[in-house]
Amino acid sequence: MRIGVIGINHKLADLKLRDALAKACQKRFGANQSVHDQHHFILLSTCNRTEVYFSSHDLTATHSYLLSILRQDVKEDFDHKLYSFFGMDCFSHLTRVTSGLDSAIVAETEIQGQVKNAYNLATTFLCLPKELHFLFQKSMGIAKRIRSELHLGRGLPNLEHAILQTGKYFFRNTQQPKILFVGASEINRKILHFLKSKQYSDMTICNRSEIRSKELAILYGLHLLPWCQLDSWHQYDWIIFGTKSSEYLIKPEKNFIPADNDKLIMDLCVPRNVEPKLGQNAKITLLNIDQINRLLKIRHRGMTQALIEAENRVNLATYEHTNRYRQKEDSKITIFAASA
């Protein structure tokens, strides 16, 4: 199979470098940007990883092409922080990723939707080669089956629990903090739903799409803050950012910071939505996705045996599907040669 991937994740690089590479990849390899002659790409960008999957007749040339483009936009030395996989190793990697086995929060569920969205977005804008269709369709199918059969992650603390516990501790002397959600992403919707079930009622949504904001406001009984009024974020106690943006949405020098009460800001995004320098303000506690993920290390200890079994199933399934693919391609060549 002529497939490969080049990527960076939470294990290998800090947020600063991941920010820079995520912005460069979105600019150069986003679905509506990815017309690159004979090279074909699918970009998978989440808070914990940025990966470019590719297919071409010359994988080595495409790999070099990718690196040369990234070096134009990212000044920091990054080559030693990247990982690359080709062929069946690439297939196995994406299946592990989609299963949640390679996530910062082991066996998290959001990654399945993120992989599906990346694939669907690419197919909307691009005519992809059959190898990339095979890679994503099979990876999603295998991952779904493994998660279902092994019940991965069920009953264990997840990101919503970590966010709730952090908020409860921070606002232990506040009965109903004013909460602002910036963005209607899947993770923000899950957190919103979870906090609502825990009797948090003073919640506001701010999103680029007014239609989506109104839908969520009706569904959960939320207040609305128009996107053009995001600069008034400091009127809230607890601000949770979960939206895509190539630029910081709030910066220290741009926004007035009142001194009356402490703020808890959670930035769940890569690239980040919040300028890190904002955390230097004595009245602001700014937490990024890596800091929140560290609260959930207990998940891994509670799932050791299931994770081993999941890894074995990934390896077996990708091996079997790769062999079938090769046999099918070989039979086509044989038939073509016989008819020539």
UniProtKB/Swiss-Prot annotation:
The keyword GTP-binding does not apply. Homodimer. PANTHER family: GLUTAMYL-TRNA REDUCTASE (PTHR43013:SF1). During catalysis, the active site Cys acts as a nucleophile attacking the alpha-carbonyl group of tRNA-bound glutamate with the formation of a thioester intermediate between enzyme and glutamate, and the concomitant release of tRNA(Glu). The thioester intermediate is finally reduced by direct hydride transfer from NADPH, to form the product GSA. Pathway: Porphyrin-containing compound metabolism; protoporphyrin-IX biosynthesis; 5-aminolevulinate from L-glutamyl-tRNA(Glu): step 1/2. Its EC number is 1.2.1.70. Possesses an unusual extended V-shaped dimeric structure with each monomer consisting of three distinct domains arranged along a curved 'spinal' alpha-helix. The N-terminal catalytic domain specifically recognizes the glutamate moiety of the substrate. The second domain is the NADPH-binding domain, and the third C-terminal domain is responsible for dimerization. It comes from Protochlamydia amoebophila (strain UWE25). It catalyses: (S)-4-amino-5-oxopentanoate + tRNA(Glu) + NADP(+) = L-glutamyl-tRNA(Glu) + NADPH + H(+). Substrate binds at T46, C47, N48, R49, S103, E108, T109, E110, Q114. Pfam families: GlutR_N, Shikimate_DH. It is an enzyme of class 1 (oxidoreductase). GO terms for molecular function: glutamyl-tRNA reductase activity; NADP binding. The active site is at C47 (nucleophile). This is Glutamyl-tRNA reductase. Keywords: NADP, Oxidoreductase, Porphyrin biosynthesis.
